[in-house]
Regions:
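Active-site-adjacent loops and short helices of periplasmic peptidoglycan-processing enzymes
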Residues: 1-120, 124-133
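Domain-terminus/edge residues, biased toward the C-terminal soluble/receptor-binding domains
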Residues: 100-101, 113-117, 121, 126-271
Length: 271
């Protein structure tokens, strides 16, 4: 399949590495390192400031809800002992173990243009992530309240960029079946471009993964100031899938499909 820029989707690979190695330690804490400040300056963030203390879990919430680059880089820097190249090597090794064949990871957050992937690989990565209960729980929240920190006197509310999760603010994007998702870029307002979105939805026991890659901003016809083309196409796919397909019993064991004559039986002539 076609290789595309991964952008913020790179965080799914960082989250996969965190959960693979630290799923039972998510309430451990770390201090946001100053060393990553210049790299993530003026990019997608959750206002997690240098020397503030966070749990691994809080960093994951920031990544999933706000596509926060400082959360990804800060956690990677901490867990790798400052060896970000080593962290990236682990990302690529795990990616290959998961089964990806057309992805390359060059940083922990997606700022670097060398991060590339494809629809099939993102499907494999998301399916792997869905095996972790913590990921499923974190992905499904429309908002997360970040506790007060050293440089934040009051808690702050992180509103998920996945508008499909919010009944109150998601508007036409909202779908009750949406379970979670991540985009490569947030949205387009005065600028233009393409967007990718990887997500999953569930209804009546049926789960589908959606990997919509490089949707042009012009395809979003909902009319909002912020255009989310890949999310627009995703929710339309969700509608089509659940309107079109349903889980049916493969075979009713009490239903007779045919009658076969039986020879040499004293009890019956047919089965």
């Amino acid at each position: 399949t076609k290789q595309v820029s991964a952008g913020g989707l790179t965080k799914y690979m960082t989250i996969a590495l965190v959960l693979t190695n630290y799923a039972d330690q998510l309430d451990n804490t770390f201090q946001m390192p100053f060393a990553i400040s210049d790299y993530v300056h003026n990019t997608s963030n959750a206002d997690m400031r240098s020397n503030e203390t966070f749990t691994y879990r809080e960093a994951l919430y920031a990544m999933v809800t706000r596509n926060a680059n400082e959360a990804a880089m800060g956690l990677a820097y901490t867990l790798s002992g400052g060896d970000l190249d080593g962290w990236v090597s682990q990302m690529n090794a795990l990616s290959q173990r998961i089964g990806t064949t057309n992805s390359t990871w060059t940083d922990a957050c997606g700022i670097d243009s060398g991060n590339v992937t494809c629809a099939v690989d993102m499907y494999l990565i998301l399916r792997y992530l869905m095996s972790f209960d913590a990921f499923v729980e974190i992905s499904g929240v429309p908002t997360f309240t970040m506790p007060a920190k050293e440089k934040h006197r009051s808690p702050s509310v992180l509103v998920s960029q996945n508008a499909a999760l919010s009944k109150s603010s998601g508007g036409n994007y909202y779908r009750s079946t949406m379970q979670g998702g991540m985009c490569d870029v947030t949205a387009y307002k005065k600028d233009s471009g393409n967007q990718s979105y990887v997500s999953w939805a569930n209804q009546d026991g049926a789960t589908y993964i959606f990997c919509v890659m490089q949707s042009p901003d012009t395809c979003d016809t909902f009319g909002y100031a912020n255009r989310r083309p890949a999310l627009y196409e995703t929710v339309r796919l969700i509608d089509w899938v659940f309107d079109t397909f349903s889980i049916q019993a493969a075979l009713d064991t009490d239903l007779a499909l045919a009658e076969i004559p039986v020879k040499y039986s004293a009890d019956t002539d047919t089965l």
